[in-house]
């Protein structure tokens, strides 16, 4: 089964927690803190595998969770780092963040990789918080949470040239003649149900990749026929070969066919509709009135297109088409599928990591924030030094300033997750 789109959830591993421990050895009555650091959480990485052709692996498994980092322990022993989860995808896979619509990665060639969810950082053990005044800190830092997000995967095949045209105009026959590809060929509409790729070797030693997609019909943009879903597989192409049936045996007008296909192309993607097109009038060998071709050629050349006559079945005119397209490819610039504006930029992502929220519920000031929660869960509130550390963290996070701005008064109740206390300046 050919699967070219998938929606999955990815969750990187959390960082391990730092340890609160003290050195305990015979003859060493006051060994000091020796809690180790937490391990790094595993990240989720996507990598190109040239052996893959579809996104089938993501059809049935929708959620992926990477390993958490191990907690630190006594003796300054660090927790184990999580092992990164590497997911393989075909070349041409575009990964998009569902929440923002931004592109996280466009994986185009062998060796391309992308981290789409970073693992959390391990927390520091209590050994790091000892100083001349605080010699036995009874607290450590918790590990940070790993990133999580819903993402969409879209396979947009890597091809230099794409074939366009109505069903049954001879695209698959053309592909089979000029490449070693073996697409299904029959005399009925929608014989091709999945995209096909083939490599064209020219007589001059050049080569290029040719993509044949299922035929498009009028109304494809509204879901008629096979819809326009497969058009994504010609988005990367530099040149389009637009094949029409010039024979008229099915009673169609080749100029109308040409215009209808381009109308659907424009509805799907304005940029794609402006891609250079070479027009090929196929089935010329069974055309009874050659003046029909001359009329077609005159009309299209008047619009600025280059027009060839061809018979894919008898191979007449094929060499001329291939030579011309090969020459065009050297003159046309590569296609940048994803613009800079569409790309995700981590440095601009403020995210929710350090966001602080304070709401008043039934007279209680409810404070939430990921950073604050991590600090709170790492503190021993029965220990005065730990409590002082937490108060300083609250101050540095701007909690007290925000509470004062909201009009808090002495004796008002503040709730931070499971912790409740009365506020006093």
Swiss-Prot record:
The keyword Cytoplasm applies. It comes from the Bacteria. It is found in: Cytoplasm. Disulfide bonds: none annotated. Its EC number is 3.6.5.-. Residues 1-158 form the Obg domain. An essential GTPase which binds GTP, GDP and possibly (p)ppGpp with moderate affinity, with high nucleotide exchange rates and a fairly low GTP hydrolysis rate. Plays a role in control of the cell cycle, stress response, ribosome biogenesis and in those bacteria that undergo differentiation, in morphogenesis control. This is GTPase Obg. It comes from Clostridioides difficile (strain 630) (Peptoclostridium difficile).
């Amino acid at each position: 089964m050919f699967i070219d789109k998938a929606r999955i959830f990815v969750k990187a591993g959390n960082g391990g927690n730092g340890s609160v421990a003290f050195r305990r050895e015979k003859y060493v009555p006051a060994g000091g803190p020796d809690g180790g650091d937490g391990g790094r959480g595993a990240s989720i990485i996507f990598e190109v595998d040239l052996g893959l052709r579809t996104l089938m692996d993501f059809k049935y498994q929708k959620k992926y969770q990477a390993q958490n980092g191990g907690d630190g322990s006594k003796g300054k022993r660090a927790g184990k780092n999580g092992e990164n989860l590497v997911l393989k995808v075909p070349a041409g896979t575009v990964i998009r963040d569902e929440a923002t619509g931004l592109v996280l990665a466009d994986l185009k060639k062998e060796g391309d990789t992308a981290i789409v969810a970073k693992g959390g950082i391990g927390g520091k053990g209590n050994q790091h918080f000892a100083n001349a005044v605080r010699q036995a800190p009874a607290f450590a830092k918790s590990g940070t949470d790993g990133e999580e997000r819903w993402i969409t995967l879209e396979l947009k095949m890597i091809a230099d040239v794409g074939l366009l045209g109505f069903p049954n105009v001879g695209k698959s026959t053309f592909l089979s003649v000029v490449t070693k590809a073996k697409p299904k060929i029959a005399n009925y509409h929608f014989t091709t149900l999945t995209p096909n790729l083939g490599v064209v070797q020219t007589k001059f030693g050049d080569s290029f990749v040719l993509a044949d997609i299922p035929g498009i019909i009028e109304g494809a943009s509204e879901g008629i026929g096979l819809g326009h879903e497969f058009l994504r597989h010609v988005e990367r192409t530099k040149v389009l070969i637009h094949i029409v049936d010039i024979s008229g045996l099915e009673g169609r007008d080749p100029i109308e066919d040409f215009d209808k296909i381009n109308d659907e192309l424009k509805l799907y993607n304005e940029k794609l509709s402006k891609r250079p097109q070479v027009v090929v009038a196929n089935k010329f060998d069974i055309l009874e009135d050659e003046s029909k071709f001359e009329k077609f050629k005159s009309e299209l050349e008047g619009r600025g297109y280059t027009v060839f006559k061809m018979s894919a079945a008898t191979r007449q005119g094929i060499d001329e088409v291939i030579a011309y397209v090969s020459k065009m490819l050297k003159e046309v610039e590569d296609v940048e599928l994803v613009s800079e504006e569409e790309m995700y930029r981590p440095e601009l992502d403020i995210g929710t990591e350090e966001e602080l929220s304070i709401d008043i519920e039934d007279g209680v000031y409810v404070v939430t924030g990921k950073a604050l929660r991590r600090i709170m869960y790492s503190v021993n509130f029965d220990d005065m030094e730990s409590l002082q550390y937490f108060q300083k963290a609250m101050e540095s996070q701007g909690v007290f300033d925000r509470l004062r701005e909201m009009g808090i008064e002495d004796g008002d109740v503040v709730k931070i997750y499971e912790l409740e206390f009365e506020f006093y300046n």
